[in-house]
Amino acid sequence: MMDSQLHIASVLLDIEAVKLQPDKPFTWASGWKSPIYCDNRKTLSYPAARKTIQDEFARQIRDKYPDTEVIAGVATGAIALGVLVAQELNLPFIYVRSSAKKHGLGNQVEGAWTPGQKVVIIEDLVSTGGSSLAAAQALKEAGLDISGMMAIFTYGFTIARENFKKAEIELTTLSDYSTLIQQAANSDFISQEHVNILEEWRKAPSKWGVK
């Protein structure tokens, strides 16, 4: 585990972009009961956190994908993030809608690019990977060459790892679930009892809390 992952986890906890409530679970749109809720859009409201995340994305892209020609953000949560990263790297920016527009040009990918250009996709959060990989497919169909996808955070679900492996797309995240739980425990955000609950949830999230 890198120190940068712990630092990003600390940032997310400090601004409450990630909330941990093992005793008062959240209900996701999917219907799952969850002891964690992640809203990385909050990072945009805190200049120091925003700059930290922007700089870490840019640093890792320079290291991992030095030939990147375009940055793509996944709508809507990663559009602003993607713009920040593209500006830092002095690269063009495009974004991907969840579906093609029903009017006008009917675009799903917005912006200017040339087929064959190498693109890195920016996401705010990866859960199962379904919507993220749908965006990647749209970029492929638009003729772009996907170098990889980067996200602020992932829950680390097995299904997500399997989905990305099947799609043959490399996923890199600035922090992850295990790191965040460790940081939360180290910083006394949660007790060891809560750590155990959070670890159990991740093993079978769809069944957790079901009576």
Regions found by a protein language model. Give the residues of each.
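Solvent-exposed alpha-helices and their adjacent loops that cap or buttress functional pockets
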Residues: 64, 111-115, 142-143, 163
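PRPP-dependent phosphoribosyltransferase catalytic core
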Residues: 3-14, 137-211
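Short glycine-rich phosphate-binding loop at a beta-alpha junction
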Residues: 66-75, 150
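Short, glycine/charge-rich flexible loops or terminal/linker lids adjacent to PRPP-binding catalytic cores
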Residues: 82-120, 128-134
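Phosphate/pyrophosphate-binding loops at sites that engage ATP/ADP/AMP, CoA/4′-phosphopantetheine
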Residues: 57-69, 139-142
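Active-site-facing substrate-recognition patch
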Residues: 1-64
